Amino acid sequence: MKEKDFINTIKTVLNSPLIGDDCAYLASLGIVVTQDSLVEDVHFSTSFITPFQLGWKSAMVNISDICASGAEPKYLTVALSLPKTIEADFVEEFYKGMKAACGKVEIAGGDITGSDKIFISVTAIGKCGDRRISSRKNARAGHKIIISGNHGSSGAGFRLLKEGKQTPESLIHAHLMPEAQVEFSKKIASSIKENYAMMDTSDGLADALSQIAEASGVSMEIDFSKIPYDKEIEIFSDFEDLILFGGEDYGLVAAVPEEITKDFTIIGEVREGSGITILKQDKKFHLSNAEVSEKLFNHFN
């Protein structure tokens, strides 16, 4: 059974309109809420990430989800499960990393328990205020597709770390200490007057595009040459796959009306249809939503 199958089962059982985006939009309270977990030997290895970096990343992956909703990140709570062998300095450095990542976002409490491996679960709360909140269901034919951040860097950095390498430093840094696209999110959500779709690219750019396409009942047409990436990833022969499927870059991709696209990087347009069409060197390649799903990381393989 695949991760998506589990999610669909949960949706069927709960039958809640709040489920479907990375954040739950609680309109009556004026907030969005999200939760994400990091598990040792699934999402990270202590052989190549420091406690400070782990704390930083744990905060940023959740702040990124809030940014994808368009809300302002405000609070985090942290549930931390640790083996008995962990020393106090690990916890100190972990929380220093979280605090550094959070900036004005306040860590408002949490829980700590024992476990066989390190398990981190973070809940993040965002304030909506006068911002318009996104939904992956809101893409419409004619919308322009805009993007923030380089893509492929984190996946390349992960490969290098697995090979015991520490350079290029920009790729290592991208994997260990990602940065949420706070200003990009604020600029869109504070100025847009119409519904729009936005997701972060934590599971890969192709995944985000496919998820929006499927939820909105549209197709995404992308000009591959417009996607921003760090040239350092060209050390890998399949760097183009890393750009689309690498994941953990925590950029944002949005489908928005053309009139607000000034000063943003446009990589394509929403069309009628389904799946993703990629324009590359005068050729077109089409990926169905199912084909994209098959190429992505699956927790339950």
Predicted ranges, named:
Residues 18, 32-35, 106-110, 124, ...:
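General beta-strand structural signal in soluble alpha/beta enzymes
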Residues 38, 72-159, 269:
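Glycine-rich anion-binding loops of enzyme active sites
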Residues 125, 253-257:
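Short hydrophobic/aromatic beta-strand micro-patches
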Residues 51-75, 96-101, 187, 191, ...:
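Small-aliphatic-rich amphipathic alpha-helix that forms the alpha element of a beta-alpha
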Residues 1-50, 69, 74, 78-79, ...:
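Extreme N-terminal cap/leader segments of soluble proteins
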Residues 263-301:
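Acidic, Ser/Thr/Pro-rich beta/coil linker or hinge segments at domain junctions
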Residues 156-173:
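Short, compositionally biased
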Residues 83-86, 160, 175-248:
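Active-site-proximal betaalpha loop/short-helix elements
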